[in-house]
Amino acid sequence: MKEEIQNETAQTQLQREGRMFSFLFPVIEVIKVVMASVASVVFLGFGGVTLACSAVALAVSTPLFIIFSPILVPATIATTLLATGLGAGTTLGVTGMGLLMRLIKHPGKEGAASAPAAQPSFLSLLEMPNFIKSKMLERLIHIPGVGKKSEGRGESKGKKGKKGKSEHGRGKHEGEGKSKGRKGHRMGVNPENNPPPAGAPPTGSPPAAPAAPEAPAAPAAPAAPAAPAAPAAPAAPEDPAAPAAPEAPATPAAPPAPAAAPAPAAPAAPPAPAAPPRPPSFLSLLEMPSFIKSKLIEALINIPGFGKKSNDRGKSKGGKKSKGKGKSNGRGKHEGEGKSKSRKSKSRGKDKEKSKGKGIFGRSSRKGSSDDESS
């Protein structure tokens, strides 16, 4: 056990010493390169000098060897020296050139084993944010609550909007319902890989829902209000029992009659939502507020109480009130002020006089005022 502990301590010390002197490895590599380059230059220098000397010796010894034959022995010696010089020069030059080429082609191959691991490059660090963004987007797309919205919400909004509280407000509510339904269809995404939420309708039902907007064709039924011709009977306002007749004006759905003609024109657009798979474009989202405004304005114009007011009703409002106002506690008030006041007078037990100058039929209200004066 002690020997193992000693061996481990020795190894740890060696590792620490190696880490301490690890910075010397690159210095040693640099020293090697410098030494090799210096040696190659020296060898090349010596080779050049020997070649030059051998050339001079040949130039001098050759004529002497030819002309002066007695000096044959020194000439042979000189030739041998020249040959050795030429060989040494060539070998030195080749070795020097080989060292230089090796340094140029493979500068750090010798110390590659001791070199540390390669660090990440600057380009890889710059590309890291894009890589992280792509991974985050892929994960967010697969989250059901964030990436893919089910079609159930859009369709439920459209159905809620179609329910109108009153007959007069049908056009307005239907326009809002259609616009919301279109928004829902555009915002929804085909949830192929995403199951619908717990309270949503089944996936098979959504395609059948858009056919519902064709129902607004029903407003054509108000053609029956031709019956309101009954109000002509009040030509005999002298009878006190006549006020029982005002029940007829309560029934008339006559005001919807002018709105009934333009109302069917608005539902002509709903067939467009039959193609929900198209993704919402940026321009369509920008045009949505103007579309909603136009639909609201059309609906308000078609409402008789807001948009279209008859000329006679305006005149009756601008005219004078009957003189019998103080005596009869408001009996002589003009009926052009609204049907709601006539209903209040019924509940209080007061009989209000009917005038033929209603704004709907375009008759003047002077007869009602004269009757009030006579009473």
UniProtKB/Swiss-Prot annotation:
The residues bearing each sequence repeat, given as ranges, are 207-209, 210-212, 213-215, 216-218, 219-221, 222-224, 225-227, 228-230, 231-233, 234-236, 237-239, 240-242, 243-245, 246-248, 249-251, 252-254, 255-257, 258-260, 261-263, 264-266, 267-269, 270-272, 273-275
| Compositional bias per record (Basic and acidic residues), positions renumbered to this chain | 148-179
- Cellular localisation: Lipid droplet; Membrane
Membrane-spanning segments: 21-43, 55-75, 81-101
**Membrane protein topology class:** Multi-pass membrane protein
Residue spans of biased composition, Pro residues class: 193-210, 252-280
Stored PANTHER family: GLYCINE-RICH PROTEIN-RELATED, OLEOSIN
Tell me which family the UniProt entry assigns to this protein: Belongs to the oleosin family.
Q: Any idea what job this protein has?
A: Many of the major pollen coat proteins are derived from endoproteolytic cleavage of oleosin-like proteins.
The protein's name is Oleosin-B6
Organism classification, top ranks?
Eukaryota, Viridiplantae, Streptophyta, Embryophyta, Tracheophyta
Gene (name only): OlnB6
